[in-house]
């Protein structure tokens, strides 16, 4: 139970951080670093779910990880793509392609699909049904992939 609470708290911290990024006056470097940290933490939680689906299923771990993913997805990460974050800044590297900033309507559509898939994953994970989680997990992965293929450099 402590793990579930800790993971959820971490996700909620990411939620607050991302949505207040611009208001806090983060530099382009800080915006890039913050969004990368959010995506890295989300990826770690995706890995946790995958490990549970491939091995012994622990419903509490899956639910905690899914809640973190949903919290980050709903955190307003778009605020971390401000002016000057479209390229490497100093020692801070980004893999976002310039096309990302030129196709905001498409990016918004992909983001909404991702948020919906992440929310569904969290809802399904709460049921503890591994097969349903597997399907919802695949949908989240597909949503991630759709953005990565178009807007993330290799």
UniProtKB/Swiss-Prot annotation:
| Gene from which the chain derives | cycA
Biological process GO terms, please?
Answer: electron transport chain
Where on this chain does heme c bind?
35-36, 95, 144, 147-148
Q: What is this protein called?
A: Cytochrome c'
Q: Name one Pfam family in it.
A: Cytochrom_C_2
User: What is the stated purpose of this protein?
Assistant: Cytochrome c' is the most widely occurring bacterial c-type cytochrome. Cytochromes c' are high-spin proteins and the heme has no sixth ligand. Their exact function is not known.
User: Subunit info?
Assistant: Homodimer.
Any one GO CC term of this protein is:
periplasmic space
Q: Name one GO molecular function term.
A: iron ion binding
């Amino acid at each position: 139970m402590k793990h579930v609470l800790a993971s959820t708290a971490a996700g909620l911290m990411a939620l607050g951080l991302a949505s207040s990024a611009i208001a806090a006056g983060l530099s382009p470097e800080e915006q890039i670093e913050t969004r990368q940290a959010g995506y890295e933490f989300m990826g770690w939680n995706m890995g946790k779910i995958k490990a549970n689906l491939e091995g012994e299923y622990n419903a509490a771990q899956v639910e905690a990880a899914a809640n973190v993913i949903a919290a980050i997805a709903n955190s307003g990460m778009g605020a971390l793509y401000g002016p000057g974050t479209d390229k490497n800044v100093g020692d801070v590297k980004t893999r976002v392609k310039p096309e990302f900033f030129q196709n905001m309507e498409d990016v918004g559509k992909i983001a909404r699909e991702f948020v919906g898939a992440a929310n569904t994953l969290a809802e399904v994970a709460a049921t503890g049904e591994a097969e349903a989680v597997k399907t919802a997990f695949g949908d989240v992965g597909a949503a991630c992939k759709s953005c990565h293929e178009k807007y993330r450099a290799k």
